[in-house]
Design a protein with these regions (language model features):
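Short, amphipathic alpha-helical "recognition" segments used to contact nucleic acids or chromatin
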Residues: 7-24, 73-82
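Short, Lys/Arg-enriched anionic-surface-contact patches
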Residues: 1-14, 62-70
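C-terminal, beta-rich DNA-binding module of retroviral/retroelements integrases
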Residues: 285-382
Length: 382
């Protein structure tokens, strides 16, 4: 008959009463209540002591020689309250400089102090490997923002499929490029962008949708080969929210005009079709006035970028306190005994890691935050 956990006090009282009655020996009473003789003698001795013998006694040791002194805990807590974004390592580093003769607790102990005081909250993170989409981005000057997209699939009269890639300046509406390509793969698109960058310089940012070759669904932050290259060039890559083409509305409107004027009827072959695209681009930029531009043509508003296309791709520069890791040939980095997959398009590249909370690290490629990861679970969080 084991004691009921729901009411241990009553069971202890019944045990003592059975001993006092003289009907049971200690051994018999312990067997009857399903406890050991050691436990039985413990409660009998406490009964003999008198007051409050039924109550549980604290198991806390009388002294804790390893406990962090209260004054040290106070230093940690006060510094954290003054700098709410600092993690344990940064707090300890600053405290060691301010109090060089003081023995400070370990990083894990510091984290425990902060957690006990309610100064660490579990980070709210989006556990999704797909890019969440970027709201519409405003432009105020030419080259603040370029937009790029493919306008579907078309077929020439000789039966060849082709895909129009278009690049436009958001502010001036200038159609920078309209190329008929045989595929939407990045290896076809990159030469178009290289030519445009050589002739016109670099924009501050490029806005695209989430389709290939601009995004890769199974890579962290959707990093495609084009996206990685643009980061290296210092170009911000924004993507519209999935299913919301209206966030790239000006480009979509231009596409409707291009489809009507440059694809109907289709060209006899790809060479003929490209001539039709060139003629449309000239008319759109040089001839057609735009009401939103005060009835000016895009060519009257557009100017080339002052940012030249570099001969050599600049190397990333990271802060001294960052942890650096080289991406393996299969797109992983090794950190804290875990292998984290980022993107096969980053192979051989160096990324930087910065701890932003206890066990939570931000991963940067150049100056772009590409992901966050949890060193405890081994999860990468987009």
């Amino acid at each position: 008959m084991p004691w009921m956990e729901t009411c241990p006090v009553k069971e202890r009282m019944r045990f003592v009463v059975s001993l006092e009655s003289g009907l049971y020996s200690m051994t018999e009473a312990c067997e009857r209540f399903g406890i050991s003789r050691v436990t039985g003698y413990k409660w009998w001795d406490r009964f003999c002591e008198g007051e409050k013998w039924l109550e549980d006694r604290s198991r806390r040791p009388q002294s804790s020689p390893g406990r962090t002194p209260q004054e040290i805990e106070t230093l940690v807590i006060e510094l954290r309250k003054a700098h709410t974004t600092w993690g344990p390592e940064k707090l300890l580093e600053v405290l060691s400089r301010r109090h060089p003769g003081v023995q400070l607790p370990a990083r894990s102990t510091t984290a425990a102090i902060l957690k006990r005081e309610g100064l660490i909250e579990k980070p709210r993170v989006r556990r999704n490997h797909r890019h969440p989409g970027q709201p519409f981005v405003e432009a105020h000057e030419p080259n603040d923002l370029w937009t790029a997209d493919y306008k579907g699939e078309f077929k020439t009269l000789d039966g060849r499929y082709w895909y129009p890639l278009t690049i436009a300046d958001q502010e001036s509406r200038y159609l920078i490029a309209s190329e008929g390509l045989l595929s939407t793969r990045g290896r076809w698109a990159r030469p178009v962008f290289e030519k445009v960058f050589h002739e016109n310089g670099l924009p501050k940012a490029i806005l695209t949708d989430n389709g290939p070759p601009f995004a890769v669904w199974n890579a962290i932050c959707g990093l495609s080969a084009l996206g990685v290259w643009w980061i290296q060039l210092g170009i911000r890559h924004y993507r519209i929210e999935p299913g919301k083409p209206q966030q790239n509305g000006r480009h979509e409107r231009m596409h409707r005009t291009m489809k009507a004027e440059a694809t109907r009827p289709p060209g006899a072959n790809l060479r003929s079709q490209r001539k039709k695209l060139d003629a449309f681009r000239y008319e759109f930029n040089e001839v057609r006035p735009h009401q939103a531009l005060g009835n000016k043509t895009p060519a009257e508003v557009w100017r080339s970028s002052a940012r030249p296309y570099p001969r050599k791709t600049p190397k990333p520069e990271y802060a001294a306190h960052h942890e650096k890791r080289r991406v393996t040939s299969v797109g992983h980095i090794r950190f804290k005994c875990h292998m984290f997959f980022l993107s096969s398009n980053l192979l051989g590249e160096t990324v930087a890691l910065e701890e932003i909370d206890d066990g939570i690290w931000s991963i940067y490629y150049y100056d772009v935050l590409v992901a966050r990861m949890d060193e405890r679970t081994g999860e990468v969080i987009s």
